[in-house]
Each structure stands twice: as structure tokens, then as C-alpha cells.
């Protein structure tokens, strides 16, 4: 059950970016599982990709091709085309070549994306057979349908949209994402597509996406497993009648950056809220670090601890598990006598020991909530980081035990 995640908000169309959805029946007959996205000619495209060494065939191709002109993005669900070797690369290339043939573009202008079961051959003929229907369905108004089309174990589609005015012109930023398990992006299985009608140089666009992803997609984790297929793309169609943004400065860039960051954050947190079997949305906030990296080390150690995650599921304020996780995070010369830990606003540990004012009833009251913040004060410096995660439930085990059956 998704935690605090409702129906999709209004997803504003982006001029110069169209989406079409069709059914290839890859995993289930009749399911719309192929999504084609068309970028206006002259669009700039940026991407961040999984750091998993076993990255999927479509990731390899997309990383190579994103440097050149991009006209189409082709996504299939139900099959990850990962762990498939050279035949997988050939299969991904074939689907791109077929789409290029149907649209009259160069095959290198088509970027492939896949999500689903790892290690199974990509059903190329099924995907090829669905491409014309997806092209016939292309529309700037198909964001919501595409958000559903890219889902796998997700229970709800995920999307966000922002608009702002600059010199009397409306700029739109809209994005969708998918993911519910195998989530610890490190640019899980996570796909994200964000488009804007602003005109942005590729260098500025790439850095904007890197910054946005590092503050959102790269700060979420459900199970600590980094997928073979993670991708997040940012497309700027340049259809808005405004000057090109060529430097990361000025009011237009600042407004665009804020909109992109807000969309990234909303769709990234939606992945956590819809985490497989999740009953809690958990914020792990680490303050007072000597470096940002040690804050991340502590945050991820807490967020990945099975003992903490199961305590969250049980609504059990077992604060000793949090202290143990902080202590094994590998922070050099950690002075535990300076550490304070909070559940919500309740101080559960002060100076490395149980807080004198703490009662079990206070902790239990916080743990009963659907949205919980664990705040850790290291007392070592001025650096801070925040991670978003979930609990670990019976349902998570069931979903993943039965995934291929």
C-alpha cells in the first residue's frame, strides 16, 4: 500500500515532447507495456545511468547515443534485457532500428530503456509489433498513460509537474518515474523521464540533471539493491520562445533549476512511498558531520539495516538498533558521547545513551505514524545529508519471492 501517495497530479503537456503507449504483451497479454517518446528536432537530452557493473544492454546503448542528436526514447516493461550479453545488445539495437525505420530517423537517434525480469531474452518481435500503435498514439497529453505504461511492481503511477513565468512566457517542467523495489539508485529498478520546453545547452542540462538527481533519486533507498537498469533522462525541447540557457546563472536558470529540482524530488519520493510492501515513509536526517560522505555513510547504514527496518514495520521503538547502526557506519574517530538521536521530535538518545527524559510510550507514539523522521546529530561539524527509505514488511518478502512465478 502506497504511503501518502494519491492520484497523479495534473501533468502539464510540454511543447515538443510527445508520448505514445501500446501493448506488446511482454509479460501479460493486453497490458500496455511499450512507451515511445518523441523529442522535437533540436532538443537537447541529458542522462544519468546506473553504476552497476552489470548494466543492462539498453543502458549501454543509451549511454553511447545520448551524446548525439536524440529524437526518440523507447521503453519496454516486463523484461530488463540485463545479463543477456551480446545477444541482448543486438536485441536492443534491433528494436531501435525498427523504430528508426518507421520514423525515418537514424538508429543512433533512438535511445532504448527496459525494466522487468533480469536474464531473459528480450522479445524483440513483440516489441517491434507494437511500435506502430505507439507511434499512432503519440500526443503531448499522454503523460499519465505513459506513467502507467512504465510501471512494473509499482501500485500507482508517479508524476509531477511545475510551471513558471519568465518575461511573460510560461515554462513547463513535467516528469514521470517508476520503481518500487531494487531501489538504491546511484547515478532501482528506477526509470525517470523529465521534460521541459526551455532551451538549454547540453552542458548546462547535464549538470542540472546531475545536481537534481544527487539531491533526489540518489538519496532514496528501499532495499539497498542498485538495479542494472537505472536511468533518468532530462529533455529540453527548446519550444518556449525564450533565449537559450547557456550558463548556470541568471533568473531564468534559477527558476528552471528550482522547477526541475522540485519535480525530481516529488517523483523520487513517490518511488519510496510506493516501495514494495511499504507501510512507512521514513526520513533519515544526519546532521553535524565532519564531511558530507560520513553523513551519507551513517544515513545509508541506518536506512539499510534490516533490524531497523523491521522495527519500523512493527512500530517498535527499538532505539538500540539505531545506535548500533550509527556505530558500525565506519565514521573514523567517532565520539559517541557527542551523539544525539531523535524519533520525530522525541530525543531517544543523548550523548550516546538513553535520554533521561525519554519514555517508551513517547517512542511508540512516533513509531505508530506512517511518516517517521529519524534524526541523528553527530556533533562533529556542519555537514548534513538526508535519505528517504521505507520499512521492511512481510509483503516485501512475498512480492520478491513470487516475482518470477
UniProtKB/Swiss-Prot annotation:
Site (Cleavage): 188-189
Catalytic activity: N(2)-acetyl-L-ornithine + L-glutamate = N-acetyl-L-glutamate + L-ornithine; L-glutamate + acetyl-CoA = N-acetyl-L-glutamate + CoA + H(+)
EC number(s) given by UniProt: 2.3.1.35, 2.3.1.1
Pathway as given in its UniProt record: Amino-acid biosynthesis; L-arginine biosynthesis; L-ornithine and N-acetyl-L-glutamate from L-glutamate and N(2)-acetyl-L-ornithine (cyclic): step 1/1; Amino-acid biosynthesis; L-arginine biosynthesis; N(2)-acetyl-L-ornithine from L-glutamate: step 1/4
Chief location bin: cytoplasm
Cited PANTHER family: ARGININE BIOSYNTHESIS BIFUNCTIONAL PROTEIN ARGJ, ARGININE BIOSYNTHESIS BIFUNCTIONAL PROTEIN ARGJ, MITOCHONDRIAL
Complexes and interactors: Heterotetramer of two alpha and two beta chains.
Record-given protein name: Arginine biosynthesis bifunctional protein ArgJ
Organism listed in the record: Pseudomonas fluorescens (strain ATCC BAA-477 / NRRL B-23932 / Pf-5)
